[in-house]
Amino acid sequence: MKKQRICIVGDGLSGLMTALALSKLESLEVHLISRKKKHFNDKRTTAVSAANYDFFNEVINKLDKKLFWPSKKIDLFYETNDQNMNFLNFDEDRKNLMYVFENDKIKNILFKEI
């Protein structure tokens, strides 16, 4: 049976995660187009929902759970010239609302698995 070919452009978190997830399907041949040189370190952090965290654990082999910081509480603020205003709060006793991680660490794992 001939495999369907898929091309993914971009080596950001979404492109890498998509490439890895699709590469696990035997009927697909996945190609990733990315930059040849990395000129900067990605020191950003990303937050994902509990469902996305579960998906990461499904797709990435032996994912180190210590790379993720679970959060059961979220407070959102906006800043004016003279004050900080809290405009939204989420608080959950039993389950995590989101998981925060450093982009570089997860991207390095994804590059190794692809």
State the predicted function of each range.
Residues 7-11, 20-44:
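Glycine-rich FAD pyrophosphate-binding loop
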Residues 15-16:
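N-terminal Rossmann-fold NAD(P) dinucleotide-binding loop
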Residues 22, 45-48, 90-91:
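Short, glycine/charged-enriched secondary-structure capping and boundary segments
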Residues 3:
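Phosphate-coordination loops involved in phosphoryl transfer and adenosine-cofactor binding
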Residues 69-114:
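Conserved N-terminal helical subregion
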